[in-house]
Amino acid sequence: MSIFLCFLLLLPLFLVFYKRLLPSKGKLPPGPISLPIIGNLHQLGKSLHRSFYKLSQEYGPVMFLRFGVVPVVVFSTKEAAEEVLKTHDLETCTRPKLSATGLFTYNFKDIGFAQYGEDWREMRKLAMLELFSSKKLKAFRYIREEESELLVKKVTESAQTQTLVDLRKALFSYTASIVCRLAFGQNFHECDFVDMDKVEELVLESETNLGSFAFIDFFPAGLGWAIDRISGQHSRLHKAFARLSNFFQHVIDDHLKPWQSEDHSDIVGVMLDMINKESKVGSFKVTYDHLKGVMSDVFLAGVNAGAITMIWALTELTRHPRVMKKLQQEIRELLGDNKEKITEQDLEKVHYLKLVIQETFRLHPPAPLLLPRETMSDVKIQGYNIPKNTMIEINTYAIGRDPNCWTNPNEFIPERFVDSPIDYKGQHFELLPFGGGRRICPGMATGMTIVELGLLNVLYFFDWSLPYGMAIADINMEEAGAFVIAKKVPLELVPVLHY
């Protein structure tokens, strides 16, 4: 009797599972054999982009997997990426509904993770016209230049005392200060409810949870729900979200104080004005959840990615003294020896710096997997049938190491971009640090300016050396992170003022 009852209880679970595993019509991409219930999850390590890369060496550039019962197709070449992001952009431009992204974006009320539709189109339009326009980029120039001067001042203090600089902390503080001033109107050098250590803790904790695996997203029926609660995953997600949400509420409350400045030019101020004026675009109305969703996008994507890119660039420059010497010589010859301050006008003069940044993006994309997409209909890509509701993963880490795209792909050679039309703006599919198609990052211009200005300052005013007794071969290149990939071991260098 008990066996019969168990069978009845488990029957719905197996029916759902069996239905999901029924073969699709047409030719699916190749891939490893999946196991019942867990699919191919047992073949994936902590570093998802590296696991995909390794599997693609065996199964090819278009590969079919199952995350539990969810079908996933991984694309690992520029040709495949172009078909997804250009040829079939419309059919693949929505996002999968995952529990972590839904939570941290206030039920997908943001721009990055929202499902494709009218609300997303209106939010995207708002972002391009009001939040990240070229006019806004110019208006906030003074903030970026002030923070870069402060970065130079702090590093100068270390140079004068001949002490190591933890570039993770220095560059995180630089990017976080800029992003929080232009987005939140908060100068954390003067803020009374949070400091920079707290900001860093919030960003890292939130990104870790945002990129974490929730069983409820991939396992059938109530099984995933139960495992998430037993394992503590559900509790961890909600605790991290509560801390982030509390921080956002502090920022909003600060804007709503009656004695607050009349300057509403920051992103929070602009969106609060829209909420208070009850303005509508057609049937679309901006709400507090939309505001917090955008805050989440900007805070989590804008702060860490820029710092990570600068750290990887400085790491590669330290490992390649020839490139470092060539870059610093060009910078100092073009800008002159006695410059007291770097401005954004100087960025157009330093061509080799741009090549170094592009080569850094190729080898160390801040997000080695683009944000996942989902097919909205059956679609044929690279000769394979991809069913509706399939998760799409584009592995930019693999594309950056594809020998069919790049000569000596594992070598750091900025000169490969000399006289090359390839850039980072989403039209060249061998280099996609900001994504491509309809879902390309709206903050791309701001992000690039922050990175270029930060690197130009630390490379113009300072020479850099390894700590005493450390050799280039000792530099640790291990990665860490899930959502964005940072250097695991901090890069600590000795700055020397260049006169």
Swiss-Prot record:
One of its GO terms (cellular component) is membrane. Heme binds at residue 441. GO terms for molecular function: heme binding; iron ion binding; monooxygenase activity; oxidoreductase activity, acting on paired donors, with incorporation or reduction of molecular oxygen. Keywords: Heme, Iron, Membrane, Metal-binding, Monooxygenase, Oxidoreductase, Transmembrane, Transmembrane helix. It is a single-pass membrane protein. Its cofactor is heme. InterPro entries: Cyt_P450 (IPR001128), Cyt_P450_CS (IPR017972), Cyt_P450_E_grp-I (IPR002401), Cyt_P450_sf (IPR036396), Cytochrome_P450_71 (IPR050193). It is an enzyme of class 1 (oxidoreductase). Its main location: membrane. The chain crosses the membrane at residues 3-23. Its EC number is 1.14.-.-. It is found in: Membrane. Belongs to the cytochrome P450 family. This is Cytochrome P450 71B21. It comes from Arabidopsis thaliana (Mouse-ear cress). The gene is CYP71B21.
